[in-house]
Amino acid sequence: MSILENQERLSEDTEAKVIRHARLADRIMTGVFSFAGWFMLQFLILLTGYILITGFMDFDPAFLSASKNGILNQLFNTVYLVILSLIISVPLGIGSGVYLAEYAKPGRLLNFLQISIESLSSLPSIVIGLFGYLVFILMTGMKWNLFAGSLAVSILSLPLITTETNSAIRSLPKEYKEGSLATGATLAQTIKHVLLPAAMPQILTGVIMAAGRGFGEAAALLYTSGQSTVINWSNWNLTSPTCPLNPFRAGETLSLHIWVMRTEGSLNPNATAIATFSSAILVLLTLSFSVITRRMSDRIQKKNQKGS
């Protein structure tokens, strides 16, 4: 056998070993990632199931009322505060993301803005709560109110929406922007009619995360929206402190109510049942909002695909 044949056989054997090792490594990593995904899915199912089962185990219809043991007022306050915070944070977050993606030039200013956004997203919510208390309560001379709470939650939500908007626009193919500009459209028209609609599904992901932050927030609201809730459901005068839609009244949310029942509810024999039921309702509320927003995202994506 010639030296050339030996080299060819050795090369084939080496190549076969490399292929076998690559396939083995691929199977191992596939198994690891599959197990990790399966584990997280099972963990989420078990956690959600546990919260829902324990929450509805001692269910009492009175829990859904506006009575002392009911959470109707807290449920309304939670939804109302999240809506207020999204009204503030969504336009600002999308606008900031568009500026970073399309208008800001690479340099120190852009780096500073990105570092500031990252720092803001990592701040503990208790710090935002104290900031909100100093600025929105003490400096304005107002009492605890839902509007101050929504401003605090908006500060926590802004980095999420800004980052997702910036990432969504930057990830779009360049042909979207170039094709629109080639037809004579301005940059503003391109952003409004081309880039934002195409990036909307991913932007809604940021909105979902922002809403989830609002639904579950407690520390920031402890110093801004307050722990008292006095609502008169027959009073719809917006200037009245008992009107449900008055944003300048104090309003305890579900997350705060859970904390109060767990820490200061020793005088209420139903405190544990109320806290677990409130937790279950909060989970259902967050899941419902996520599902609705996801369906909106899917419809927008299908509409964009049909239009293209």
Task: Provide a role label for each language-model segment.
Residues 63-69, 221-281:
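Interhelical loop and adjacent transmembrane-helix boundary motif
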Residues 96-107, 114, 143-195, 202-210, ...:
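Membrane-cytosol interface at the C-terminal ends of specific transmembrane alpha-helices
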Residues 10, 104, 166, 170, ...:
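C-terminal transmembrane helix and the adjacent membrane-cytosol boundary/short C-terminal tail
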Residues 118-156:
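Generic hydrophobic transmembrane alpha-helix motif, especially the helices
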Residues 85-117, 130, 138, 293-302:
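Transmembrane-helix boundary motif in ABC transporter permease subunits
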Residues 1-36, 294-308:
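Transmembrane alpha-helical segments of polytopic membrane transport and secretion proteins
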Residues 76, 80-88, 92, 96, ...:
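Hydrophobic alpha-helical transmembrane segments of multipass integral membrane proteins
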